[in-house]
Amino acid sequence: MARAKFLREKLHVNVGTIGHVDHGKTTLTAALTKIGAERFGGEFKAYDAIDAAPEEKARGITISTAHVEYESAVRHYAHVDCPGHADYVKNMITGAAQMDGAILVCSAADGPMPQTREHILLSRQVGVPHIVVFLNKADMVDDAELLELVEMEVRELLSKYDFPGDDTPIIHGSARLALEGDQSDIGVPAILKLVEALDTFIPDPTRDVDRPFLMPVEDVFSISGRGTVVTGRIERGIIKVGDEIEIVGIRDTQKTTVTGVEMFRKLLDQGQAGDNAGLLLRGTKRDDVERGQVLCKPGSIKPHTEFEAEVYVLSKDEGGRHTPFFKGYRPQFYFRTTDITGACQLPEGVEMVMPGDNVKMVVTLINPVAMDEGLRFAIREGGRTVGAGVVAKIVK
């Protein structure tokens, strides 16, 4: 029996390193893979292999990201590390690498720097739920009081952006010494302490299947003698024949009942997150439903027209605009399956936004869309993507 327990798949958790340039994010990433591989299995990735991050495309935006993995006693971690600051901004806004928690790396010698602040703010805006801190380069600081001071500054910064600064685990260490196999407190043991902090401070993520049902409408068909079938990919939750659902967005919310679930032309009892399914709806007419709406568990999501967003504007090289835009800019916002026109209100003191910038804005849509905080969208002009964003806060 003991053997079966050992074979059990470990819980999968997504994390990533954030923090100022040259504070040691990539060195720490390498140390995590090395010590993880030695203790719990997995593969060591050297600094150079991580630093040469391949480019990938997310929503038409090129982002350099390194993906590594390592294990703890109880979890399997998938970890992202980005070489440049711009890559972080793009990664977090597009949600290319969704994080269940982040490791904020801050040099003990330098303390919090501008990107330290910006990455914490971005984490708050895009909904990274938990942050654990690694105060790196502790071997370069002899003065214990100085370390304490830096730790206090980091805690204040976290609290300022609504993270629990006082309760956040902060581990002092040296990623470089740990990589060299140093056994002093700030070497290998510090990395093990960090992994333990990840295990305990970042709660188990809720799987998509366990969340309330939601399916964006991709297509609507009328099948004579049977009624209306709506197709799409189930984003979260489970849907069973006989369940009551709501149709939300664009127009007034309607209630209906699912009388059939189909996949690959076969009738099923239920569909779940990740499935491409067709749902047969009772008493619903072909014209009652359109692309851009969502089917959902009643009361689980509401339609909104006004929200605060964090937006990245594509540079000219990425195929974005060649010129800045100004207040009153009215592009299309592509949510899930459809474009909806909206007007942009820029922050006070911001006259224009240049290609390649990231900016906070308030958007007012001409039609309501079913949304929660954390929903990603693209900004388009005539079908061409010119930006990417995330709903930071719903206004109304």
Swiss-Prot record:
Family: Belongs to the TRAFAC class translation factor GTPase superfamily. Classic translation factor GTPase family. EF-Tu/EF-1A subfamily.
E.C. no: 3.6.5.3
Enzyme superclass (EC): hydrolase
Lineage of source species: Bacteria, Pseudomonadati, Pseudomonadota, Gammaproteobacteria, Lysobacterales
Transit peptide is among the record's keywords: no
Function summary: GTP hydrolase that promotes the GTP-dependent binding of aminoacyl-tRNA to the A-site of ribosomes during protein biosynthesis.
Gene this chain is encoded by: tufB
GO cellular component annotations of the record: cytoplasm
Region (G4): 136-139
Keywords: Cytoplasm, Elongation factor, GTP-binding, Hydrolase, Magnesium, Metal-binding, Nucleotide-binding, Protein biosynthesis
G2 as annotated region, ranges: 60-64
Ranges where the tr-type G domain occurs: 10-206
Quaternary structure annotation from Swiss-Prot or TrEMBL: Monomer.
Subcellular location: Cytoplasm
GO MF terms, alphabetically ordered: GTP binding; GTPase activity; guanosine tetraphosphate binding; translation elongation factor activity
Region (G1) residue spans: 19-26
Protein name: Elongation factor Tu-B
Record organism: Xanthomonas campestris pv. campestris (strain ATCC 33913 / DSM 3586 / NCPPB 528 / LMG 568 / P 25)
Keyword Repeat included in the entry's annotation: no
Binding site for GTP: 19-26, 81-85, 136-139
Residues that, per the record, bind Mg(2+): 26
Region (G5): 174-176
Biological process annotations from GO: translational elongation
Catalytic activity: GTP + H2O = GDP + phosphate + H(+)
Segments of this protein annotated with the region G3: 81-84
